[in-house]
Curated annotation (Swiss-Prot):
Provenance organism: Chlamydia muridarum (strain MoPn / Nigg)
Compartments, record wording: Cytoplasm
Enzyme nomenclature, EC number: 3.6.1.9
Name by which UniProt lists this protein: Nucleoside triphosphate pyrophosphatase
Family: Belongs to the Maf family.
Gene3D superfamilies documented for this protein: 3.90.950.10
HAMAP family: Maf (MF_00528)
Keywords: Cytoplasm, Hydrolase, Nucleotide metabolism
PANTHER family linked to this entry: BIFUNCTIONAL DTTP/UTP PYROPHOSPHATASE/METHYLTRANSFERASE PROTEIN-RELATED, BIFUNCTIONAL DTTP_UTP PYROPHOSPHATASE_METHYLTRANSFERASE PROTEIN-RELATED
Cofactors: a divalent metal cation
Reaction catalyzed: a ribonucleoside 5'-triphosphate + H2O = a ribonucleoside 5'-phosphate + diphosphate + H(+); a 2'-deoxyribonucleoside 5'-triphosphate + H2O = a 2'-deoxyribonucleoside 5'-phosphate + diphosphate + H(+)
InterPro entries per UniProt: ITPase-like_fam, Maf-like
Length: 196
């Protein structure tokens, strides 16, 4: 348990999820420009590449001996990737598109320490209610949708618009815990060890 864990993220949600499992870690923002990677049609490849670049950016800040954890999450609907909205209007349009439908939330994780890298992806299916059009902008303004891929957040008002979730709810929060623990075990670490 002597390895320093670094969560390469500025996401308060990812930080809160990991803190719940009592494992000691520090947060370091990767400062990687996500817009430098172009989506080529494969959301798994896209999120893995983004997560790998985030981990590499953290490693280059002097954390190569640490175990770096990075993630990238996207919403996918009918082959289109929804990242974080660029404006309130963009967030409203995303929610309008997703209203009354089902979509996928895909998170790719990368764990990196020195030259060793492990990665995996998780998919969760989310179904929305038919969101009343007059409430779209209200939701966006009430729940800081500009910081959330797809323009929504499961723990902030998600209960108003989410009809059903199939799969890992932590995945929607950007840090699928079961998958993370499986990857940590490749580095001889288990979240179970910190819960005792």
């Amino acid at each position: 348990m002597g390895t320093q864990l670094v969560l390469g993220s500025s996401s308060k949600i990812r930080k809160a999820v990991l803190e719940a499992f009592r494992i000691p870690f520090i947060c370091v923002s990767s400062d990687f420009d996500e817009r430098s990677i172009t989506y080529s049609g494969d959301p798994f490849e896209y999120t893995r590449e983004l997560a790998w670049n985030k981990a590499n950016a953290v490693r280059s800040q002097g954390f190569s001996d640490s175990l770096i954890i990075t993630a990238d999450t996207v919403v996918v609907y009918e082959g289109e990737v929804f990242n974080k909205p660029e404006s309130e209007e963009h967030a409203v349009e995303m929610l309008r598109t997703l209203s009354g439908t089902s979509h996928s939330v895909i998170t790719s994780l990368v764990l990196m320490q020195n030259e060793k890298v492990a990665s995996a992806s998780e998919t969760t299916q989310v179904s929305f209610i038919d969101i009343p059009p007059q409430h779209l902008k209200t939701y966006v303004q009430a729940f800081s949708s500009l910081k959330r891929c797809g323009g929504y957040c499961v723990q902030d008002g998600g209960g108003l618009i989410i009809k059903q979730i199939e799969g890992c709810v932590y995945n929607i929060q950007g840090l699928p815990i079961k998958t993370l623990n499986q990857l940590l075990m490749e580095f001889n670490i288990s979240l179970w060890d910190y819960l005792a």
